[in-house]
Amino acid sequence: MCQRLCDDFQRAGADCQCIHGDIRQSQREKTMQQYRDGKLAILIATDVASRGIDVDDVDCVINFDVPAENEYYVHRIGRTGRAKRKGVAYSIIGNFPEKAKLDEIAKFSNYQIKTMVLGADGSLTEEEVKVPAPPKRRFR
């Protein structure tokens, strides 16, 4: 998934590289140095490969999953907005258990998490996402 996403970005003309477990450590280190030096606009990393990344100037983090641990999520998005800079984090979720987890993280971290809906045309709109009520049981 990580490599495929990177390939898609590159085909679209984006200056992008990725790091994941199938890439040699020497190549990961080279890619990280390019990113730190500002020679690379977009870095895509798997969860495991991203651990230990220390980069000061990150404008945006996009999460394709929600970590199980609240602290890890806060650490992951904390890469944005360091040194009084502004940053933004997006989390792409596709089911209500992940939405509930984001709500839990918002309470834990005291962050405001805005919910937006991705339309079929690629547009983002602010809409309240309502969790469907559980079916009512009938007792006889």
PLM regions: where:
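Conserved helicase RecA-like core
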Residues: 1-131, 135-140
